Amino acid sequence: MLHWNPAQYLKFGGERTQVVRDLVHRLSERLDNEQVRRIMDLGSGPGNSTAVLAEAWPQAEITGLDASPTMLEAARAAYPHLRFLAGDIPTWAASATALYDLVFSNSTLQWVPGHTELLPRLLQRVAPGGALGFQIPGNGSAAACRLPRELAALPAWREYFGPGKVTERWTGQMTDFYDLLAPHAAAVEIWETEYFMVVAGVEAIVEWYMGSGLPQYLNALPDDAARARFREQYREGLRAAYPVRRDGRVLFPFKRQFVIARPAAG
């Protein structure tokens, strides 16, 4: 199961927050910014996305929602002037009655099941003239993301990864977003951007995924020795997939998928 470490996640805080800024910039071009009064940030994590939203729309009442106690603690400590609530996204989507000028989510919905019901419900929480805007990683087939799954399926490791041990990411297509939202929307924008991070070596890629999906694989293993072996095999796979460049550094490409949906009138 997923376990979130805010300090580990924020080792790459600049890179993780850049995608928030890019989506917020696009949203600011689409919205009547003076009319943005209420914002919900779903999966607010350590608060970095909520802080960017507050910079863009300082007049708005902004709430961050997250299910991780450690992430909420970090967010409240870093941004005491902002409001953060404990809760999970499907429950909020099914029970919320208020409307928001912006329902926002950064790099979270890939971990949330039931997109067929969830995405239309999120759009229903958007006020007229507002938007649903979210981003998720689009790198599920990239080696760094694929290798833990492949290792877990090997005979040497298979016994440790039974049902419920690992939270699977959403594996649909970008076209699914359009098909799920378009019947309920006045307009849907979808796009993908590939970011190339320059890192010192593959250990930086290991550290990146230690801030997201890799710990759940390591936590499923019986002892530190097994965890060290799994991590080293992961590292070996990364070395083959991400070669060292002429200057001694490594390029780490990372695709991000973006969606903006505007509610239909009436």
What is the predicted function of each stretch?
Residues 15-35:
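Conserved alpha-helix/loop element of class I SAM-dependent methyltransferases that forms part
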Residues 38-93:
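Class I SAM-dependent methyltransferase SAM/SAH-binding core
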Residues 102-115, 138:
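A short SAM/SAH-binding and catalytic strip from SAM-dependent methyltransferases
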Residues 46-48, 168-266:
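Conserved Class I S-adenosyl-L-methionine
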Residues 2-17:
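Class I SAM-dependent methyltransferase Rossmann-like catalytic core
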Residues 112-113, 126-128:
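Helix-to-beta-strand junctions that scaffold the AdoMet/dcAdoMet cofactor pocket
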